[in-house]
From Swiss-Prot:
Function: Forms an efflux pump with AaeB.
Protein name: p-hydroxybenzoic acid efflux pump subunit AaeA
Keywords (A to Z) from UniProt: Cell inner membrane, Cell membrane, Membrane, Transmembrane, Transmembrane helix, Transport
Gene name as annotated: aaeA
HAMAP family with a match to the protein in the record: AaeA
Record-linked SUPFAM superfamilies: HlyD-like secretion proteins
High-level lineage: Bacteria, Pseudomonadati, Pseudomonadota, Gammaproteobacteria, Enterobacterales
Amino acid sequence: MKTLTRKLSRTAITLVLVILAFIAIFRAWVYYTESPWTRDARFSADVVAIAPDVAGLITHVNVHDNQLVKKDQVLFTIDQPRYQKALAEAEADVAYYQVLAQEKRQEAGRRNRLGVQAMSREEIDQANNVLQTVLHQLAKAQATRDLAKLDPERTVIRAPADGWVTNLNVYAGEFITRGSTAVALVKKNSFYVQAYMEETKLEGVRPGYRAEITPLGSNRVLKGTVDSVAAGVTNASSTSDAKGMATIDSNLEWVRLAQRVPVRIRLDEQQGNLWPAGTTATVVITGKQDRDASQDSFFRKLAHRLREFG
């Protein structure tokens, strides 16, 4: 009898331990898979592609790659004498047409005063037409001069904001064309996190919810707030044919990959360029308030650690 009782006790204890282990694993797995978090997150920032509005030879490059610059600081300079001479030529054209317009105005006025008694109507109309033509040429020359005044200023390329110069690929002596990107400027204090959340986890993501950001390769946890959730993503399985009809790709019903939706997260504190734009991180949405790590259960701590390893 004692032997039977002992066997039943061992069996019951083993069964209870198995059930508890199953429950623990199940809860950890559910929390790991269904809670709003993602490893597919990246630091981002506002980036300005700087391109000159004039073409010419680069005479001076005043910065080096990855340098922190201030707003309006000179980045590089394009050959100025060419545009200064073009401005002088435009001003000379304006002066010429001003003198010519004055002469034609006097001539037309004289003929209008004399009238048809001294000359034909055709000669009077011709003088007025010539005056109007010269006035139009003067207006065109003035517009050209005003535009030429802008070009010497545009030969000096300045930083539009405080930030870091990156991917600098221009050097003194090179010829640069108008509109070609010369350098990128990563704006200071503009960093944020772009987290790509699976659609199955969006129920726990709302603007204003708090977030934890763990950069890859770091144990430091940054704090942030959900700023916005994207209103739509591209439907990769749907296209349009030549007649505008929808074309839907076939898929296997038992294999459904969740779409990832961009979620923008505003950082509580800017970290400078400690984590450059494009680097990855793990993001956990904690809800309306920050998570109190000291009150987490064993399962939550385990799941949180699992996230860091993927």
